[in-house]
Amino acid sequence: MFNRILRAFRNDISLYGELKGNPEFASESWMVLTISIVISAALATLTIIGDGVLTGIVWGVISALGGIFGYIVLVVLAWLIGTKLAKGTGSITDIRAAVAYAYCIPAILTPIPIIGFIASLWLLVTESSAIRETLGIGKGLTFLIVMLSIGAILVYSVIVSGALMALMTTGAI
């Protein structure tokens, strides 16, 4: 499992051919995704806990929900656009597994200041490779899928940040 995570982080595109159609890796990818989101949420909590324990916990929960939302949006968009419009080959399970491995290390590093920004940029590269290799589609379409998912994640971030700021302003948090 850890070898596959490192291969995805190194952007070893041969990994995605091995993952495709293999039910063992499909179930293992759930574990990979869960571990990465939990660690990312814990790091997000620790980076802001100086502002108060409750604020840190809320930030960690928001981080976890954002990670889950981002993953789901990317997988669904990749599947819909990649298989229905572009006629790529690959099941939603194949896409889900490939994206989970590519998502892992950058998702863990994202809450860490400065390193997180670099990890976010690298996440774009690894996710693009995972989608492109799993579905067998072109770079342009892969870029579109990733950009649409980023747009959805930005909308999510603005809504959640606005709600959080409103709660903090009213003293609820």
Give, region by region, the residue ranges found by the protein language model.
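Low-complexity, charge- and small-residue-enriched intrinsically disordered regions
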Residues: Y16-L19, S128, I173
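Low-complexity, intrinsically disordered extramembrane tails and loops of integral membrane proteins
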Residues: M1-N3, T169-I173
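N-terminal juxtamembrane cytosolic/stromal segments of multi-pass membrane proteins
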Residues: M1-I39
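Hydrophobic alpha-helical transmembrane segments in multi-pass membrane proteins
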Residues: E28-V76, A97-E127, L144-G171
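Buried hydrophobic packing residues in well-ordered domains
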Residues: D12, I81, I131, L144-M147
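Membrane-interface segments at transmembrane-helix boundaries
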Residues: L6-A8, A78-Y101, R132-K139
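Helix-boundary and loop/linker segments of multi-pass membrane transporters
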Residues: E18-P23, G50-V53, L135-G136
